[in-house]
């Protein structure tokens, strides 16, 4: 009878039990892959996961397999070929041994230190057995550092031997160019390399430190005498109490400077000062809130600190004799903070109350700092050069493109072709100028003066235009405010100074008398009196001389007779053409004379109802010189 292999019971119904630990009842897999090849493996477990003893090697089989010599199976092994030769500069390329060392340097003539410890790195280059010594840079050491010994092979004795990596170890001294270096440690690569070459390394040592450098690293000890002032009490009493002052900084003395407004805050809790700039809309400045951060402000520095550059000075209590306090901020007084002068012009109500209670100062009025309009700048004209009119020359200074001066158009229209003519003589110390006569014409439309000298035959003086039409400045007036001659300045007996020449007015024409009569308010009593005296002299009968009778000039008598003859002929055929205006158009200077060519041109344009012989005789009598004709007397013959 078959029994159960587990517990030995007969394999009968009711005696067979199910093993709950067995879950896999498939057949073992015998096909697989190894190194890419399909292989067959013997199953090691059966159905249900029971291990099969049939396919397992025994211990004896395993021992037999282990005792087999591979040579018996595979034969004698071939000897490996020798490795290729590699030179030292290739094998040890970029392989460097690093040692940490130091040397001691004497410091003579120093009270603070007698020697100095300088830490270095010694580099040994395996490719060519060269060495270099590098000193790490220490900040603010004051000595040249960096490469002390450049890369080279270094001698170790007087026989010419050089240092080799076998001579280097931890805890030894080496001498290089008279300096003794103490090697204290090496890096990890150096330690591994030396140990691989069979060198036993000494234990590492502690790096020696420079005593003076370590002393400088220690914080300075301050010995401060305790004060009776209690800062904690000040902090608790004046916490959140701030004095506010309004100030300005006037920088107009510098180029492109201006006045800026600031707010100065003084914190009573710790006596610190803060300055803020007041910005306006569209002022074109960066809107940074603070000009100066909150800090204590030194007022008086010690003398030693003044010689030290302030740009690198760290201000402490040792450099400051006096700090700014609340009593230094007074309304109406300037205050210099860090080289910038501020003028305090106002404060807030809390500050006024604090000053009244603390210092007894109650008079802190607000100072008006509003911008005042500067007075208008008076334009300074360059000196007058004497050419042209002053108004015309001044236009070059008013605009880039000069413009003509403004003219009184209404005056020009009302006084068009109105000319005041005067007979004048030249006041001169020279006898040849005594008999010279001039015609002064004053143009009412433009206030200009022209002077014409009638030519006199055989006088030796060339007549004609003496002064072109221009404005004449009165003597004594300045170039800035020139005063020109006006109609009221011309009267009989008046002296007119024209550019250094003095003219005395002797007579006037009838139009001047009519103009003075209609505009008597413009003239002085002296001018009116001179005209009245002149009229009386003309109307008075000529006095009879004893034994003599005034003889009339025959030339004048003949001219008057000729004019009477022509006017008698014009009674039947009167001349209605305005000949005078035709001559005045060509006589720009209003001198009463025109040249001969112009005279005949004008006469040819009119049909004069007079005999040609009378006209030729009248032209001969009105001629002055070879080229000038007096058209005044000529026109007088044709006037009704």
Curated annotation (Swiss-Prot):
Domain EF-hand, chain residue ranges per copy: 574-609
Record domain DM10: where: 93-198, 239-359, 416-520
Residue numbers spanned by region Required for its localization in the mitotic spindle and interaction with alpha-tubulin: 1-45
Disulfide bond sites: none
GO biological process: cerebral cortex cell migration; cilium-dependent cell motility; flagellated sperm motility; mitotic cytokinesis; mitotic spindle organization; regulation of cell division
Main function: Microtubule inner protein (MIP) part of the dynein-decorated doublet microtubules (DMTs) in cilia axoneme, which is required for motile cilia beating. Microtubule-associated protein which regulates cell division and neuronal migration during cortical development. Necessary for radial and tangential cell migration during brain development, possibly acting as a regulator of cell morphology and process formation during migration. May enhance calcium influx through CACNA1E and stimulate programmed cell death.
Entries under PANTHER family matching the protein: EF-HAND DOMAIN C-TERMINAL CONTAINING PROTEIN, EF-HAND DOMAIN-CONTAINING PROTEIN 1
Protein name per UniProt: EF-hand domain-containing protein 1
Protein species of origin: Bos taurus (Bovine)
């Amino acid at each position: 009878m078959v029994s159960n292999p587990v517990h030995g019971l007969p394999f009968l119904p009711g005696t067979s039990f199910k093993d709950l630990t067995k879950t896999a009842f498939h057949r073992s897999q015998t096909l697989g892959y190894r190194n890419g090849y399909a292989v067959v493996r013997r199953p090691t477990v059966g159905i249900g996961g029971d291990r099969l003893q049939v396919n397992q090697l025994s211990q004896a089989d395993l021992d037999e397999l282990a005792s087999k010599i591979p040579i018996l199976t595979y034969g004698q092994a071939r000897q490996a070929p020798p490795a290729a030769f590699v030179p030292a500069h290739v094998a040890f390329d970029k392989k460097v041994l690093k040692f940490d060392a130091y040397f001691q340097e004497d410091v003579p003539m120093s009270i603070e230190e007698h020697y100095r410890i300088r830490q270095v790195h010694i580099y040994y280059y395996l490719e060519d057995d060269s060495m270099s010594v590098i000193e790490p840079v220490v900040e603010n050491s004051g000595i040249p550092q960096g490469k002390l010994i450049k890369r080279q092979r270094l001698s170790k004795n007087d026989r010419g031997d050089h240092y080799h990596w076998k001579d280097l170890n931890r805890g030894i001294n080496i001498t290089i160019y008279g300096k003794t270096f103490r090697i204290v440690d090496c890096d990890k690569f150096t330690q591994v390399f030396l140990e691989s070459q069979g060198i036993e390394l000494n234990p590492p040592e502690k790096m020696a430190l420079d005593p003076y450098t370590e002393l400088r690293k220690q914080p300075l000890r301050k010995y401060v005498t305790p004060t009776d002032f209690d800062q904690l009490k000040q902090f608790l009493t004046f916490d959140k109490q701030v004095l506010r002052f309004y100030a300005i900084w006037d920088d107009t003395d510098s180029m492109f400077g201006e006045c800026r407004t600031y707010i100065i805050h003084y914190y009573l809790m710790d006596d610190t000062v803060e300055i803020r700039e007041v910005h306006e809309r569209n002022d074109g400045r960066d809107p940074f809130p603070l000009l100066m951060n909150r800090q204590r402000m030194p007022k008086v520095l010690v003398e030693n600190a003044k010689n030290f550059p302030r740009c690198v000075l760290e201000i402490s209590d040792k450099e400051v004799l006096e700090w700014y306090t609340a009593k230094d901020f007074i309304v109406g007084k300037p205050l210099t903070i860090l080289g910038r002068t501020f003028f305090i012009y106002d404060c807030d109500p809390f500050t006024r109350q604090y000053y009244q209670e603390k210092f007894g100062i109650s008079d802190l009025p607000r100072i008006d700092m509003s911008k005042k309009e500067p007075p208008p700048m008076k334009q300074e004209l360059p000196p007058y050069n004497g050419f042209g009119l002053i108004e015309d020359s001044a236009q070059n200074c008013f605009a880039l493109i000069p413009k003509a001066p403004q003219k009184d158009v209404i005056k020009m229209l009302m006084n068009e072709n109105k000319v005041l003519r005067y007979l004048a003589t030249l006041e001169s110390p020279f006898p040849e100028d005594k008999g010279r006569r001039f015609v002064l014409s004053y143009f009412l439309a433009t206030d200009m003066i022209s002077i014409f000298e009638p030519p006199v035959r055989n006088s030796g003086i060339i007549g004609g235009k003496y002064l072109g039409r221009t404005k004449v400045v009165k003597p004594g007036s300045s170039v800035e405010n020139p005063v020109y001659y006006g109609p009221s300045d011309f009267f009989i007996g008046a002296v007119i100074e024209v550019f250094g020449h003095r003219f005395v007015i002797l007579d006037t024409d009838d139009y001047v008398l009519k103009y003075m009569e209609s505009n008597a308010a413009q003239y002085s009593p002296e001018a009116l009196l001179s005209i009245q005296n002149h009229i009386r002299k003309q109307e008075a009968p000529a006095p009879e001389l004893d034994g003599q009778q005034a003889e009339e000039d025959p030339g004048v008598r003949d001219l008057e007779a000729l004019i009477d003859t022509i006017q008698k002929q014009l009674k039947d055929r009167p001349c209605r053409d305005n000949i005078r205006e035709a001559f005045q158009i060509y006589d720009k200077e209003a001198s009463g004379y025109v040249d001969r060519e112009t005279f005949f041109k004008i006469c040819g344009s009119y049909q004069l109802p007079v005999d040609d012989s009378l006209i030729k005789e009248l032209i001969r009598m009105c001629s002055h010189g070879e080229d000038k004709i007096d058209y005044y007397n000529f026109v007088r013959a044709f006037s009704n």
